[in-house]
Amino acid sequence: MRQLISSENTMQKTSFRNHYVKRFSSRQASKSRKENQPKRVVLFNKPYDVLPQFTDEAGRRTLKDFIPVQGVYAAGRLDRDSEGLLVLTNDGALQARLTQPGKRTGKIYYVQVEGIPDNAALQALRTGVTLNDGPTLPAGIEIVAEPDWLWPRTPPIRERKNIPTSWLKVTLYEGRNHQVRRMTAHVGHPTLRLIRYSMGDYTLNGLDNGQWCEIAQEKDR
């Protein structure tokens, strides 16, 4: 009986070990395939009212309606109501570099807000404001003219009569949900329109609204 128990234990251990080796080998093979895949980077000028994903059960417009490239995913999000640069890639290291706060990668937005922020509001945005998920990092904030390269939005924004609007150039080094909108609302100037212009070295230059392009990725970028 003692020998039978020992034999069963040996079989169980051997079976477990073989199962572990198979699972480990499968993971290694999958990882190897991913590492051997060519790195792809797609830049997309996302229109208003397009979801930053490839599928949607509700039938709304998604990236699939514009981009035929498979196996790439957005580095960070860009709200359905926001426009501009979306970087899509299959390179996990690049995604981390563009999105993780610790990497301090700058992202530039052009933001139309209600009203004209005074110096106190601008300085608050520059030094950081406290939102419901904590204080924001210092940001670059400038009042600028409406960009001359900007396309018309469809539908246009809803402006209130007798209330002026202004444009801000905002540079962030972090990325929280709806962060720019929450920041401007916090200082009393709701965002009316938001366009992301750049993420790190990637920009909208040369991309019309709704247009995408694939670029070569440098090995040591």
UniProtKB/Swiss-Prot annotation:
EC number of this enzyme: 5.4.99.20
CDD domains on file: PseudoU_synth_RluE
Pfam families named among the record's database cross-references: PseudoU_synth_2
GO molecular function, one term: 23S rRNA pseudouridine(2457) synthase activity
Record keyword Isomerase present: yes
Highest taxon, organism lineage: Bacteria
PROSITE patterns xrefs: PSI_RSU
Catalytic activity: uridine(2457) in 23S rRNA = pseudouridine(2457) in 23S rRNA
InterPro entries from the UniProt entry: PsdUridine_s_RsuA/RluB/E/F_cat, PsdUridine_synth_cat_dom_sf, PsdUridine_synth_RsuA/RluA, PsdUridine_synth_RsuA/RluB/E/F, PsdUridine_synth_RsuA/RluB_CS, RsuA_PseudoU_synthase, TruA/RsuA/RluB/E/F_N
Family from the record: Belongs to the pseudouridine synthase RsuA family.
The protein's name in its UniProt record: Ribosomal large subunit pseudouridine synthase E
Protein's organism: Salmonella typhi
Gene name linked to the record: rluE
